[in-house]
């Protein structure tokens, strides 16, 4: 089946209203028709309020003239138009128009969704855990927000390049490698660990021991520093051990990504070490252009746009006084590489809001260097913090950072108890499968349904609830529809456009038609919570429809139309959840 774009009903109405405005007020040609969904009609236009001054008339009079023009045009999109209030146009669609739209979307493998991002190459930087350290709650938001954006933009046609900027370089590796060499009995390889024990957990503990020895033993500290030099110089044995640590860590990260349903692959990894050979070029280029300058032995870029608390220009550290490089230089190398080598049209950095100043300075420097031009869009996709019940950054009772795997285990355990209480007939295997889908989905949805710039409290009890705006509620809505369709068996689900619409059918059909618009808003604003809100409203509209409109007990023609609505709702929910990286179970 070939995909075919279906023009949304709201867009059809916008075109009709715009044409009527052009006839009544030619000097306002191209003005926004300001069409929005309405509780008083299918859609409402407020354009007359904004244009009345230009027309030198009252908004109500202009609205009446536009309504007359709409009727005269004989628009197939607008069946009825009335004027209310100070000049609102209330616009109603013909029942046949709505049913035709349902049939068109149902017939299309992509639900009729357009490809507005087609041919746009978008590089998304997200997740970025540190090698030899466990992923913790701080990695949750970047990983799932970045993945959701990658999915949505890819579905809308963008060529998405995922970049996992691993923290895989630095002095800490010299310390860890030296400790491992001096303690050959240390257990940390995945094959040697007990089931359920993570390589990165073992390495993290060994690093802490190495740090303790580094601080207590000057001799070990000297040997660790020498090991750093050996690593940077490419010493064969040291590099081999470093690569071993990186490979084992990536296996552990893969377990988290697989469990979260994240699309990142090993080929998407381009850590700090990847850019090592490019750092000197960055220094030379910025120095030659007069952008970087000496500051007490260090090389810095003084901002022309941002000042610090003391009123002096904010600085970006290009090279330290000891000749080393930090993440400022590495991030400059990433942006140049992604523009010059990956040929990005759009760059997205899904990173904690606390890094806002850093990215302002990196983007400014890249523009001054000529790497970042108006042909490339760049954005720091900032996000807030996951909080504990006390309203502070989420920690364990001992004050440690919460491990991401522990957090997921807690959610799936709670989901298992909740699902078991609702359905006592489930087998243990079914219960485990459903609990994993519900628990992981609950964690992801709770995060994604929160405006990304806001902090939110991690409340697992609320997350796994079957009530309210939760992932479990949406998953359960999908399973209810699947139950109806299983009972329907081979019953026909074709659309008869001549049938009258029940108000609940109409509300559901209009909500289904708004799916593409919600996705476009996510892509434009980089805010996944808008898709969550859409899906929640869709599930609510289906609940209202199901309570008001019998499906299987209806007469054959009505039943066929209502089954078509069920099929389209299930497909839309399933597609929407998939774009969030959340499973849509058949049973629950």
Swiss-Prot record:
Subcellular location: Cytoplasm
Gene Ontology cellular component annotations, sorted alphabetically: cytoplasm
Catalytic activity: tRNA(Arg) + L-arginine + ATP = L-arginyl-tRNA(Arg) + AMP + diphosphate
SUPFAM superfamilies: Anticodon-binding domain of a subclass of class I aminoacyl-tRNA synthetases, Arginyl-tRNA synthetase (ArgRS), N-terminal 'additional' domain, Nucleotidylyl transferase
Cited InterPro entries: aa-tRNA-synth_I_CS (IPR001412), Arg-tRNA-ligase (IPR001278), Arg-tRNA-synth_N (IPR005148), Arg-tRNA-synth_N_sf (IPR036695), ArgRS_core (IPR035684), DALR_anticod-bd (IPR008909), Rossmann-like_a/b/a_fold (IPR014729), tRNAsynth_Ia_anticodon-bd (IPR009080)
Keyword Transcription set for record: no
UniProt keyword annotations, A-Z: Aminoacyl-tRNA synthetase, ATP-binding, Cytoplasm, Ligase, Nucleotide-binding, Protein biosynthesis
Endpoints of the signal sequence: none
Record GO terms (molecular function): arginine-tRNA ligase activity; ATP binding
EC number: 6.1.1.19
Main location: cytoplasm
Intervals of motif 'HIGH' region: 129-139
GO terms of biological process kind: arginyl-tRNA aminoacylation
Subunit structure: Monomer.
Family note: Belongs to the class-I aminoacyl-tRNA synthetase family.
Protein name, entry field: Arginine--tRNA ligase
Provenance organism: Frankia casuarinae (strain DSM 45818 / CECT 9043 / HFP020203 / CcI3)
Lineage: Bacteria, Bacillati, Actinomycetota, Actinomycetes, Frankiales
Gene designation: argS
